[in-house]
Amino acid sequence: MNLIAAAIAIGLGALGAGIGNGLIVSKTVEGIARQPEAGRELRTLMFIGVALVEALPIIAVVIAFLAFFG
């Protein structure tokens, strides 16, 4: 049962991060296409957003370790 819980935690964490990163990057590209002069600011905000979204799989791995070994 712990193995299933760990797999679900990692899988859903990766799924959420993948969808979130895709949305962030697509909206950034759309914004740069509309306003090329704002590209530098949008790119900076994109990297901050991607970093925040990537925290989710890291937290999911920690929860999976706790479920598996705890």
Swiss-Prot record:
Pfam families named in the record = ATP-synt_C
Tell me which CDD domains the record gives.
ATP-synt_Fo_c_ATPE
Compartment(s) of residence: Cell membrane
UniProt keyword Membrane, yes or no: yes
The organism's place on the tree of life at top rank: Bacteria
**GO CC annotations?**
plasma membrane; proton-transporting ATP synthase complex; proton-transporting two-sector ATPase complex, proton-transporting domain
> Keywords for this entry?
ATP synthesis, Cell membrane, CF(0), Hydrogen ion transport, Ion transport, Lipid-binding, Membrane, Transmembrane, Transmembrane helix, Transport
InterPro entries the record matches:
ATP_synth_csu_bac/chlpt (IPR005953), ATP_synth_F0_csu (IPR000454), ATP_synth_F0_csu_DDCD_BS (IPR020537), ATP_synth_F0_csu_sf (IPR038662), ATPase_proteolipid_c-like_dom (IPR002379), F/V-ATP_Csub_sf (IPR035921)
GO MF terms listed in the record are:
lipid binding; proton-transporting ATP synthase activity, rotational mechanism
**Site for Reversibly protonated during proton transport, residues:** 54
**What is the topology of this protein in the membrane according to its UniProt annotation?**
Multi-pass membrane protein
Its transmembrane ranges are: 4-24, 45-65
Grouped into one coarse class, the protein's main location is membrane
Q: Which family does it belong to?
A: Belongs to the ATPase C chain family.
Q: What does this protein do?
A: F(1)F(0) ATP synthase produces ATP from ADP in the presence of a proton or sodium gradient. F-type ATPases consist of two structural domains, F(1) containing the extramembraneous catalytic core and F(0) containing the membrane proton channel, linked together by a central stalk and a peripheral stalk. During catalysis, ATP synthesis in the catalytic domain of F(1) is coupled via a rotary mechanism of the central stalk subunits to proton translocation.
Q: Spell out the subunit comment.
A: F-type ATPases have 2 components, F(1) - the catalytic core - and F(0) - the membrane proton channel. F(1) has five subunits: alpha(3), beta(3), gamma(1), delta(1), epsilon(1). F(0) has three main subunits: a(1), b(2) and c(10-14). The alpha and beta chains form an alternating ring which encloses part of the gamma chain. F(1) is attached to F(0) by a central stalk formed by the gamma and epsilon chains, while a peripheral stalk is formed by the delta and b chains.
What is the protein's given name? Answer: ATP synthase subunit c
Taxon lineage: Bacteria, Bacillati, Bacillota, Bacilli, Bacillales
